[in-house]
Amino acid sequence: MKIHIGNGARLFVDVEGPGLVPDGARMREKPTLICMHGGPGFDHAAFKPAFSQLADLAQIVYYDHRGHGRSDPRPSSEWTLDTWADDIVRLCDALGIERPIVLGQSFGGFVAQRYIARHPGHASKVILSSTSHHMGLERKLAAFERRGGPEARALAQAFWSQPSRETFEAYWAGVRHLYNTRPAADPEASGRTLVNLDILLHFVGGEKQDLGLLQGLEQARCPVLVMVGEDDPVCPLEDALEIHDALPPQWRQLARFPGVGHGAWRDDPTAAFAVLRKFIAE
């Protein structure tokens, strides 16, 4: 379904599971888990079907960021972290969601970090999964070289330094398999993802180049879980450790996954979902 969030913008939203469930002589309200996808330029498909296993704990709201996937096209002037972060609040207002648990994967984690800075009292909990706080080019290049040798480093250097359709296509064909340490459980999953390269190239060539999200993390006013695969080349371990250290000590939690790449639930779903279930239920 498409939800109006103001000023003519509509987001594609999919909801899994009831929010109210029978519990003896009463109806119990489950928390709402909002899942924000990576990219930018991709859609929410990567969360499905894996995240369905959390539907017993929380009502799950998947959505495509403004301009992405099945959401309405929007002008490039709206393709900014501030706008995408504010859209979380707009979407919650439209759906009547209060105190959500907000999960941001990769680029979705950039959005979640900006959301923490701009709306520190809005969430009940935040999960920052496989994300970074800056470009961190040299770390990326070193990580890709460790995983795939000099050729992988060169492909990463070309795309992240000079983003274009040509450099992205070469990069994606040459290093996408290095993002994770295990083969995809579903080889057809990538084909289900809707991709908008215009948004990807706009962001990587613009706001991403000078990205700096650490300072805003001191605004956190709720528990924040940082999840990181220790062998993630695109959002390296060091970035996650710096994100964790920038959060207020009373709110921060860290989950490291050895031998795991980008998106811990892909490479070690048993461990990753155990951590998520514990954090959601706390």
Predicted regions and their residues:
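Conserved alpha/beta-hydrolase "acid-adjacent" motif
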Residues: 233-239
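Short beta-strand/loop motif that positions the catalytic acidic residue
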Residues: 220, 226-228, 232
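Flexible "cap/lid" loop of the alpha/beta hydrolase fold
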Residues: 125-158
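Conserved HGGG/HGGXW glycine-rich cap/lid loop of the alpha/beta-hydrolase fold
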Residues: 9-73
